[in-house]
Amino acid sequence: MNIIKTGIKQSLVSGIYSKVGIRAFCTHYSAELEWVKLSDDNKVATVGLSSFGAQRLGKINYVELPKEHRKCRREEKFGVLESSNATAFGLYAPVSGEVLEVNEKLKKSPSLLNEDPANNWMVKFKVSKPDEFKKLMDSNKYKKFVQWYR
């Protein structure tokens, strides 16, 4: 029964990948310790702090995020985290775009990034250059990067 379900699921997913592109379904990572998820239509990038980044920084005490509608170029600083292990840790745009939304909950509860970094995003960008997403690391490259970083 599981084999059949798995086979159906895999072929269904393979069909979706070929229509939309694999980028829409994978989490990618920046060298600035951020995770990035691209929407199904490749127009919105959701950005958060990676688990490794949260671990490395220690307890996050303060989050400064950009205002909505701000335009950022790839690798441009858009915010700051302050933590027990880093006085100020810069946040950099993994792709070029306009800030659509910021996670306001983080301003009141910055420790959410420590508690569940995978599900507590920081910023959503309207992507202006989708090809820049290819410059980010997939999970395998990120694992190697993290090993080197340690």
From Swiss-Prot:
InterPro entries: Biotin_lipoyl, GCV_H, GCV_H/Fam206, Single_hybrid_motif. GO terms for biological process: glycine decarboxylation via glycine cleavage system. Residues 44-126 form the Lipoyl-binding domain. GO terms for cellular component: glycine cleavage complex; mitochondrion. Disulfide bonds: none annotated. It holds the Pfam family GCV_H. It comes from the Eukaryota. Belongs to the GcvH family. This is Glycine cleavage system H-like protein gcvH2. It comes from Dictyostelium discoideum (Social amoeba).
